[in-house]
């Protein structure tokens, strides 16, 4: 089933008070330095039906959209050629990054760069029960301080999650996620792939992808320098960490319980 951000967010903010809170949160995350402009944008957007408002937030609010507003500061009077008051949301081109569905729960990711931290998923999780039914777990909270992005998260089976330690996903973020998911789900281990921190290898899914239950594509440049770690939950409720010395193909075959895998 394909679902659409605009539709599901609009459902989540159907209540007028939730709509106000959502809009205030989005404006607070949009780096608006002028109270006068902020108030004008709030009034402009709040007057729209929910679906239209969400679509406009995603597309960005241009200066030409706000015809008049009351100047309340020097910054209100200073003009430049930049076309937007509120920038478009680049995350919506890469929808696997802001969140991930993992077992019976969801990650709402704290993105690595500020431009990508204006999110819609938090409201969908909190207020849209078609999207996140009662009992859905939250493994990773968007408000956490450590970055994880969804391109680094790969569910291998009901017991194993792979995650990239990369340019955009931190070790601290992985620890926070692993602590939650291993305590409260069927997952028994998190396999950490440390990949080179450069833009060409930005996420795990740019260099390693599962295409069948026992088949994977892998970028040849990461096979040599690849470091692997396994994170499990101890009987005392504390995380255990170990370096993996097995070859990747052997490790994958073992955790997937298959005779062999094709890379």
Predicted regions and their residues:
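The feature marks the mature, well-folded catalytic cores of soluble enzymes
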Residues: 1-263
């Amino acid at each position: 089933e394909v679902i659409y951000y605009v539709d599901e967010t609009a459902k989540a903010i159907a209540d007028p008070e939730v709509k106000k809170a959502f809009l205030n949160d989005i404006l607070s995350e949009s780096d608006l330095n002028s109270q006068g402009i902020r108030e004008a944008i709030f009034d402009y957007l709040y007057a729209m039906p929910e679906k239209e408002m969400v679509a406009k937030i995603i597309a960005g609010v241009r200066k030409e959209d706000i015809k008049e507003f009351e100047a309340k500061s020097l910054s209100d009077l200073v003009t430049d050629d930049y076309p937007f008051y509120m920038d478009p949301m680049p995350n919506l081109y890469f929808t696997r990054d802001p969140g991930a569905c993992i077992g019976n729960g969801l990650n709402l990711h704290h993105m690595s760069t500020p431009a990508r931290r204006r999110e819609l998923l938090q409201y969908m999780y909190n207020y849209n029960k078609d999207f996140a039914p009662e009992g859905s777990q939250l493994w990773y909270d968007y408000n956490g301080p450590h970055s994880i992005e969804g391109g680094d998260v790969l569910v291998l089976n009901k017991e194993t999650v792979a995650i990239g330690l990369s340019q955009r996903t931190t070790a601290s973020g992985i620890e926070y996620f692993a602590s939650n998911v291993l305590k409260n789900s069927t997952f028994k281990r998190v396999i950490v792939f440390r990949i080179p921190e450069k833009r060409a290898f930005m996420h795990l899914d740019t260099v390693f992808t599962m295409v069948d239950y026992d088949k994977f594509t892998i970028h040849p440049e990461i096979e040599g320098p690849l470091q692997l770690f396994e994170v499990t939950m101890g009987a005392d409720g504390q995380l255990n960490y170990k370096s993996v010395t097995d070859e990747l193909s052997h490790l994958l075959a073992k955790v997937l319980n298959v005779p062999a895998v094709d890379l």
